[in-house]
């Protein structure tokens, strides 16, 4: 699990990343836009997305919906971060849902690879090292649960 300092850093980070619905929508679009730009092969997992969605994650309904859904899921984890059993259950649920779609732990590692760049862009370079490390630890936990 995560230690107390990591949990605190995640909660602080979430005040910016998940402040409200429009913020989560914007940040979800930003994160997936970076993922698709950096690792175009990851698009294969999004069979319901068309070229317009990939090109404009922040303006298409499907793109915005996926972004806000992902950030809502992250928000559930962070809101529950002090309950290790709940966080573990949420991580396993996320894993089951993604494995069913052919998304592997290696694919999650690609998301982890772009996450620090995402944090810098989403926070206008105001994310602290502690917040980046805590977000990385949460992603590592999700990857480990993804079996």
From Swiss-Prot:
Keyword Metal-binding on entry: yes
Single GO MF descriptor: heme binding
Coiled coil: none
UniProt keywords, alphabetically: Cytoplasm, Heme, Iron, Metal-binding, Muscle protein, Oxygen transport, Transport
Chain ranges of the Globin domain: 1-147
PROSITE patterns attached to this UniProt entry: GLOBIN
GO cellular component: extracellular region; hemoglobin complex
InterPro entries reported in the protein's UniProt record: Erythrocruorin, Globin, Globin-like_sf, Globin/Proto, Mb-like_M
Transmembrane segments: none
Residues involved in heme b binding: 66, 98
Location in or out of the cell: Cytoplasm
SUPFAM superfamilies: Globin-like (SSF46458)
Keyword ATP-binding annotated: no
Subunit structure: Homodimer.
Family stated for the protein in its record: Belongs to the globin family.
Protein name as catalogued: Globin
Native source species: Busycotypus canaliculatus (Channeled whelk)
